[in-house]
């Protein structure tokens, strides 16, 4: 009952007018307390008066005011009692509806606040003679006798928690701010302006606006407050209201998903992602469909180390509606074209379907089929027109291979590259570097090459003959490709080099290590040359390149060419069709296109590119032939039918159809001989022919008349 009476008196007292400073006894001398938007008295006039609940009352008179402020001096309370607490030299009740309730939610009944209201904190150890609640923004603070610590708030702090009294003096006296005032941001227990979030630490913090819980400067790596663990620099996404990491710390990789960003270990870049190392901009865990380093529409990928170019990965699975290309470097739209390897076609799925674009690394042939190499259909090359890959004919006359622009790169035997054209060699040459008889680089079978002074080309003529004197041969003991070469020189100080005798001193590059040369032969050849039948030969020049592929060191052949054997510098020519042999009559391995029969090799059937077991059992078909999966023995011409597969007349290169049903996949149709390659129509050609006949006839008639008339004259 007394409590209710006391509360009623207090509330009646508070119903007085707002704090004003006056000089009369019982009036407020100093309005020094601000609670919320209101001001209250902190010092009164008159010896018997002191502030209770922010107003001046007579605290000498017995009653509730004296209970709340039992001790006073000089217009201020020096001790509080009951359910009050001291704040800025006044005693305040913590009851609801009173100004003190905004400072303290409960007190201990002996004049000390035990639970501070939001925006304030209760210093540990405060007595009823000391201020026992401090504003979070009070930077002056209060010194508590017990322990001697001065407890302070933080400038512009709106909410906080009390310092840890057990911590050191310096660490334990400042409150921990949990929310700053309006327009301020909490950073490292300091309330700062928004622009100061990144002061001195570029992009290490971000300003996060939060009107409910308070604005904060959040460290990029503070995952407990919305940051990203192991993040080095970041930004704030206003749309998602999330911190977005822009660079992870060393040895971590930035991964971005629909849920946000994270920093992960390298081995976690999987399941639709792959790692990219970048010491400058930061390592990244990129999605397989990354527009720069990934593959469009790729869902599952694998990192390719050391690859140069745009894509750093190969794709093993694509998103719906797409499939990996043959080389796994792109994702291609899934089509319903029945032509194998076809990406786009007209009359899709019908009998008259025509493929217009191939997928992956395959090329569109002249017959609208898809093939992995244009060289398989003859003198064609792979070209790119826009986004399409096409097989185009190498139109340069006598050209063996063209580049992807159609420019001739190598000429057929008997021709040499002359600018963009192929010009004929001299009739005595098999291959040449120019058009004269002394420009031969290889000779026809049975003819020997004699190099000129520069050692790069020479003349083709009859094989080795014996004689005496300088440059003559004593023994013609080497035969290569039907032509004989010298194996022992007539002059003992000379030796055969590439089959020709000359002294060591006359060589532009000495190829024999013997010093001096003795007996007209070389005992040890230099590196990059190999010894053969008394002479030294090169693997890059004829005739040496015919018999040896590699001779890097030691002056001996390390790898003989197919069809030859070199044993201690002595050449053995294997039998026909033999790739490797123990002797000239004992073959151990046959060349492609031959099959082993006892110790010899038998040529495969004409329909076979390779055969196995018997000459007519094709392992791979020759150009112009095909073989069905169920077919045995020889291959079938592209023009003929076999085991349910239909051939196509005039087809020069083909493959069996899928599932071995229907027509062959024809890659090239032969020229019938009536093709008009000039581009003129048949009518135009006929008109020109008639005109030529008329002109020629008229000219002959005129000449006859002229001579007859002159004869009469």
UniProtKB/Swiss-Prot annotation:
SS bond list: none
Signal peptide: 1-17
Outcome, altering residue 606 to S: In strain: Adelaide-1
Residues exposed to the Extracellular side: 18-679
Keyword Metal-binding appears in the UniProt entry: no
Superkingdom of this protein's organism: Eukaryota
The protein's name in its UniProt record: Major surface-labeled trophozoite antigen 417
Organism: Giardia intestinalis
């Amino acid at each position: 009952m007394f409590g209710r009476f006391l509360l009623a008196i207090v509330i009646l007292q508070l119903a007085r007018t707002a704090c004003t400073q006056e000089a009369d006894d019982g009036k407020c001398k100093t309005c020094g307390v601000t609670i919320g938007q209101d001001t209250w008295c902190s010092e009164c006039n008159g010896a018997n008066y002191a502030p209770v609940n922010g107003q001046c009352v007579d605290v000498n008179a017995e009653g509730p005011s004296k209970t709340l402020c039992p001790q006073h001096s000089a217009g201020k309370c020096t001790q509080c009692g009951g359910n009050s607490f001291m704040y800025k030299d006044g005693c305040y009740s913590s009851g609801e509806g009173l100004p003190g309730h905004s400072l303290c939610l409960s007190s201990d009944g002996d004049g000390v606040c035990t639970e501070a209201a939001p925006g304030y904190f209760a210093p540990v150890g405060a007595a009823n003679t000391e201020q026992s609640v401090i504003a979070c923004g009070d930077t002056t603070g209060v010194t508590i006798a017990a322990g001697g610590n001065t407890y302070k708030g933080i400038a512009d702090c709106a909410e906080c928690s009390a310092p840890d009294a057990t911590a050191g003096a310096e660490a334990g006296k400042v409150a921990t701010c949990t929310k700053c005032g309006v327009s301020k941001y909490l950073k490292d227990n300091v309330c700062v302006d928004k622009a100061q979030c990144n002061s001195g630490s570029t992009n290490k913090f971000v300003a996060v606006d939060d009107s409910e819980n308070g604005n904060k400067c959040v460290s990029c790596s503070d995952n407990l407050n919305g940051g990203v663990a192991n993040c080095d620099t970041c930004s704030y996404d206003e749309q998602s209201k999330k911190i977005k990491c822009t660079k992870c710390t060393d040895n971590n990789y930035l991964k971005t998903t629909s849920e946000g960003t994270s920093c992960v270990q390298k081995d976690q870049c999987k399941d639709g992602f792959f790692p990219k190392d970048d010491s400058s901009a930061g390592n990244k865990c990129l999605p397989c469909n990354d527009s720069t380093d990934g593959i469009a529409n790729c869902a599952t990928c694998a990192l390719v180390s050391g690859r140069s170019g745009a894509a750093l990965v190969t794709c093993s699975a694509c998103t719906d509606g797409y499939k990996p290309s043959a080389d796994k470097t792109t994702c291609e739209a899934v089509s319903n074209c029945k032509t194998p390897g076809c990406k786009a076609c007209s009359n899709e799925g019908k009998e008259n379907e025509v493929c217009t674009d191939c997928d992956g690394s395959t090329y569109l042939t002249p017959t609208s089929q898809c093939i992995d190499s244009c060289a398989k259909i003859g003198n064609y090359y792979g070209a790119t027109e826009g986004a399409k890959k096409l097989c185009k004919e190498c139109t340069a006359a006598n050209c063996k291979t063209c580049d992807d622009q159609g420019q001739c790169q190598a000429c057929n035997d008997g021709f040499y590259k002359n600018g963009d054209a192929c010009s004929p060699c001299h009739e005595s040459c098999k291959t040449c570097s120019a058009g004269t008889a002394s420009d031969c680089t290889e000779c026809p079978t049975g003819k020997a090459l004699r190099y000129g002074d520069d050692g790069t080309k020479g003349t083709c003529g009859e094989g080795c003959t014996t004689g005496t004197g300088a440059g003559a041969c004593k023994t013609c003991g080497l035969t290569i490709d039907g032509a004989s070469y010298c194996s022992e020189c007539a002059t003992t100080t000379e030796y055969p080099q590439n089959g020709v005798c000359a002294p060591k001193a006359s060589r532009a590059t000495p190829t024999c290590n013997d010093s001096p040369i003795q007996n007209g032969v070389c005992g040890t050849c230099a590196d990059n040359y190999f010894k053969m039948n008394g002479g030294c030969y090169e693997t890059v020049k004829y005739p040496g390149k015919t018999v040896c592929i590699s001779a890097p060191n030691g002056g001996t052949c390390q790898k003989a060419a197919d069809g030859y054997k070199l044993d201690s510098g002595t050449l053995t020519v294997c039998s026909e069709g033999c790739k490797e042999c123990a002797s000239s009559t004992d073959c151990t391995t046959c060349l492609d296109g031959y099959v082993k029969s006892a110790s010899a090799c038998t040529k495969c059937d004409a329909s076979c590119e390779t055969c196995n077991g018997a000459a007519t059992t094709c392992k791979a078909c020759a150009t112009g032939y095909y073989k069905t999966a169920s077919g045995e023995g020889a291959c079938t011409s592209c023009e003929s039918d076999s085991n349910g597969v239909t051939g196509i007349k005039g087809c020069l290169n083909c493959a069996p159809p899928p599932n071995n049903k229907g027509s062959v996949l024809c890659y090239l149709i032969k020229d019938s001989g009536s093709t008009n390659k000039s581009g003129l129509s048949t009518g135009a050609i006929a008109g020109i022919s008639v005109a030529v006949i008329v002109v020629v006839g008229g000219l002959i008639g005129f000449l006859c008349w002229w001579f007859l008339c002159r004869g009469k004259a």
